[in-house]
């Protein structure tokens, strides 16, 4: 029996020191938080996603879903369709403690996208990549530039080697190019439902292939937080106002319903209406600030 001598993903308790988490992002590029989401939250989230999975796909072109193979199921916009996500997962205080430290050099941040992927048996592994395809400008940032994107991966079923746990190449955020890595350069992010994988911008990674024969899919929700200097991949401006006003101020900020503030020298913010704050012009209420 041989022991893998490669450095492995660090696994931290959800109440670990945030400074340590941020150091790991800079040193390794990724880490796992154990048990961040309680069982009842995972269970509720899965029930809501089951409902969305059962809805027939809408007619007409689907810009992303139509590009995926049949072993790969995709549900967009979980912030609108899943109350558990927008009212609990999206405003998790640990996630935001990490984001506030991570984005401190670029200012406010918001949700760029959150969607479900369900990977069924027979789905091959992804090629290694960075999460910069939606905003190609990120590809041209120098290594010393502050990060403007953070990937947060929520497993909602068990992640194992056999069913395609995410493969992460530690330290690859310091590479100038992705190149053609070998799979043995990566480490596996095996996880339980409720764990969370946090991945720094530029880290090279891939979803593994699902080699199971029992027909059990691997279910994951991917959430991407970006600096407010980047336009979100998904827009949430079509959400019913009643739904928006049932959310907290933080949740509304994450979905682009409030004026946000980049770093200096911007002194007024972005997402303005007629030189005024968006929420003031809309007279927007919130669950934790009804007035």
UniProtKB/Swiss-Prot annotation:
<comment type="subunit">
    <text>Homodimer.</text>
</comment>
<keyword id="KW-0408">Iron</keyword>
<dbReference type="GO" id="GO:1902181">
    <property type="term" value="P:verruculogen biosynthetic process"/>
</dbReference>
<keyword id="KW-0843">Virulence</keyword>
<protein>
    <recommendedName>
        <fullName>Verruculogen synthase</fullName>
        <ecNumber>1.14.11.38</ecNumber>
    </recommendedName>
</protein>
<comment type="function">
    <text>Verruculogen synthase; part of the gene cluster that mediates the biosynthesis of fumitremorgins, indole alkaloids that carry not only intriguing chemical structures, but also interesting biological and pharmacological activities. The biosynthesis of fumitremorgin-type alkaloids begins by condensation of the two amino acids L-tryptophan and L-proline to brevianamide F, catalyzed by the non-ribosomal peptide synthetase ftmA. Brevianamide F is then prenylated by the prenyltransferase ftmPT1/ftmB in the presence of dimethylallyl diphosphate, resulting in the formation of tryprostatin B.</text>
</comment>
<keyword id="KW-0560">Oxidoreductase</keyword>
<comment type="similarity">
    <text>Belongs to the PhyH family.</text>
</comment>
<comment type="pathway">
    <text>Mycotoxin biosynthesis.</text>
</comment>
<dbReference type="Pfam" id="PF05721">
    <property type="entry name" value="PhyH"/>
</dbReference>
<dbReference type="GO" id="GO:0051213">
    <property type="term" value="F:dioxygenase activity"/>
</dbReference>
<dbReference type="InterPro" id="IPR008775">
    <property type="entry name" value="Phytyl_CoA_dOase-like"/>
</dbReference>
<keyword id="KW-0223">Dioxygenase</keyword>
<feature type="active site">
    <location>
        <position position="68"/>
    </location>
</feature>
